[in-house]
Amino acid sequence: EEIKNPYFAHGLDPIVRRNEFKLCGILNGIDDMGYNPKYDKHLFAPYSPEDFAGKKVCKSELQRMLGLNDSADTPIIAMITRLAAHKGLDLVTTVIDEILQDDVQFVLLGTGESHFEGWFSDLAKRYPGKVSANIMFNGDLSRKIYSGADIFLMPSKSEPCGLSQMIACRYGTIPIVRETGGLKDSIHPLENGYTFTNYNAHDMMYVIREAVSDYKNKEEWAKLMYRAATTDFSWNKSAKDYESLYYDMLKY
């Protein structure tokens, strides 16, 4: 639907609309065995959707490793992203100081545009014990963050599909995404995460605070974690969608 819109199609929308009967959108998938907290050797402790006890260990050890205050009841909001404008970082920089007045911690992993690298590095210096900015690419640390965080923030301006929100779900870390592209197609409120529609910093902050409030209800949060972790984002599902499409094409 988005590529039929002039904003996203960059002038090609008339052609796309004329040929929309030829279009079919299929989500990417992830390696559900490669991203499996029960067997992932990068984690501080294994766990599964049936038993999240190991995730508590992962969180405590992540806090220790990154120099964050050791607090099991403080939700960790994480971003693993390329530091680029279209990833929604201007929304984060607008309201993160306000968000950090609440009982939350913030962890960032990524590299990219130098002004964002510097900005988040300075943020970590201003909030010792609450913020960890890791300006690097580190596959091992990314797994530790996926497993140790509570909330995964992905406020992209545009995102054709996105994989990070799927990986976060697999590790029982609840995504907050903006409703664009594949993020809208993969994350559904009350089912496996939180969403907001408008590209607006305060709309994002409202949803973050909603999630942080819900986090305090441990029983309901555990149910949300289970639903997220058991969402089928495997390539098996995507492959079936491709197979169905190919069969439909053979009819013409």
What are these regions (language model features)?
Residues E1-Y252:
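Catalytic cores of nucleotide-sugar-dependent glycosyltransferases that transfer UDP/GDP/TDP-activated
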